[in-house]
Amino acid sequence: MEKYILSIDQGTTSSRAILFNQKGEIAGVAQREFKQYFPQSGWVEHDANEIWTSVLAVMTEVINENDVRADQIAGIGITNQRETTVVWDKHTGRPIYHAIVWQSRQTQSICSELKQQGYEQTFRDKTGLLLDPYFAGTKVKWILDNVEGAREKAENGDLLFGTIDTWLVWKLSGKAAHITDYSNASRTLMFNIHDLEWDDELLELLTVPKNMLPEVKPSSEVYGKTIDYHFYGQEVPIAGVAGDQQAALFGQACFERGDVKNTYGTGGFMLMNTGDKAVKSESGLLTTIAYGIDGKVNYALEGSIFVSGSAIQWLRDGLRMINSAPQSESYATRVDSTEGVYVVPAFVGLGTPYWDSEARGAIFGLSRGTEKEHFIRATIESLCYQTRDVMEAMSKDSGIDVQSLRVDGGAVKNNFIMQFQADIVNTSVERPEIQETTALGAAFLAGLAVGFWESKDDIAKNWKLEEKFDPKMDEGEREKLYRGWKKAVEATQVFKTE
């Protein structure tokens, strides 16, 4: 009887369940979207119960649609949108407020106040993160400060906090397991990534009671079992957890120090495995935990690109220059270059290494001869220039020259982007056969814990290359193009509307 690992990929707009066999191949997929709530400008929220319902639905669907029995599931892995915060009543199981999503800016004033009080470096040193509304800690504080009676309940031990992984494990296990893993804990602003413990000083600054917090566990371990009424009478081990970007790093088999993956999603996320050393960044990168396994943790440097694949969506939906995302490739290849045109897609500011929230998108180098093809090519080249910005920051901070770049996300299907990426970073770009690397990473972590796979070496054999793109551009051309990009970014940062 063939066995499978069931991977739950709980994302920002949808929940997915994917079955993987022992070769790491996909045996079934189910997906369900859920509602986004925008109560005020800049606020983004989810209903945690709707997320839970969507997860139950896709788990049921993927099993039923693929004629798999529940007793064929060897283990469950969970990967999740990171930082999104749920606070719930531990007796009723009901959230006391919507889940506050990672994108939400409603805690900006809390961050600003802590910065004014001089605590930014304290948080940076202990957590590797910036004092930003992006991370979970200020979201918990906001809920406790703004929901009537919440703080009193929390202090009495009646409330629990969790990121989405914690919420799902608690529900799946029938309220038995209140846990998170090292990778998710490292995104909360409350976890000391050096001591590997919740930090009392940070909790005091955020006024968050410690009794709300989940137990922090390795990313690959049996945390509990599904309660039988959720899983066709079966008690299936819940055995692997990692935040989405860390799961993608693991799914790309980036197990060695210096291994790098880049995800081209709506935004872009690059992670470098820095081994057992937490590298302090001088270049605006985040220092974070990659995963905890085999009794130790691996650290990572992370760079964020705010606009990646969404630049192609903008060409399609905003400017209506293309009818579909794949069409961007055919337009881009109709011309030999952009003829000096640069698009800086700073629609919501610039991420790593600039961290300029006030910058806005700009276009440079237009002439009477500029055509649609040049504009489209310049827009999709911007994904690759931004990736080089982050990669150079990583090499500078870590002292490691990147030997190859493993890639995933929607834009990797575009061969033009992949080749231009290899050219502009002067490094081989490796596109895997299975591009569902986030879900695969969670499956690998769960599979290791239940003996479905024996070791990381066993897993590495399952990673298969679909295509390798080697750099073909000469050095002079590469540096000339990149100098132009740096000038364009500089000009973008100078131009600020009032």
Swiss-Prot record:
A single GO molecular-function term is: glycerol kinase activity
| Annotated metabolic or biological route of this protein | Polyol metabolism; glycerol degradation via glycerol kinase pathway; sn-glycerol 3-phosphate from glycerol: step 1/1
Q: List the keywords (alphabetical).
A: ATP-binding, Glycerol metabolism, Kinase, Nucleotide-binding, Phosphoprotein, Transferase
The residues that hold ADP are T12, R16, T266, G309, G410, N414
What kind of modification does the protein receive after translation?
Answer: The phosphoenolpyruvate-dependent sugar phosphotransferase system (PTS), including enzyme I, and histidine-containing protein (HPr) are required for the phosphorylation, which leads to the activation of the enzyme.
**Pfam families listed in its UniProt record:** FGGY_C, FGGY_N
Q: Record-annotated residues binding glycerol?
A: R82, E83, Y134, D244, Q245
What this protein catalyses is: glycerol + ATP = sn-glycerol 3-phosphate + ADP + H(+)
Residues given in the record as ATP binding sites: T12, T13, S14, T266, G309, Q313, G410
Q: Which residues carry this modification: Phosphohistidine?
A: H230
Positions of sn-glycerol 3-phosphate binding? T12, R82, E83, Y134, D244
Which E.C. number(s) belong to this protein?
2.7.1.30
One Gene Ontology cellular component term attached to this UniProt record is: cytosol
**Biological process GO annotation list?**
glycerol catabolic process; glycerol metabolic process; glycerol-3-phosphate metabolic process
Q: How is its activity regulated?
A: Activated by phosphorylation and inhibited by fructose 1,6-bisphosphate (FBP).
Which PANTHER family is this protein grouped with? GLYCEROL KINASE (PTHR10196:SF69), SUGAR KINASE (PTHR10196)
Complex formation: Homotetramer and homodimer (in equilibrium).
Family membership: Belongs to the FGGY kinase family.
Q: Which NCBIfam families match?
A: glycerol_kin (TIGR01311), PRK00047.1 (NF000756)
Protein purpose: Key enzyme in the regulation of glycerol uptake and metabolism. Catalyzes the phosphorylation of glycerol to yield sn-glycerol 3-phosphate.
State the name under which the record lists this protein. Glycerol kinase
Taxonomic path: Bacteria, Bacillati, Bacillota, Bacilli, Bacillales
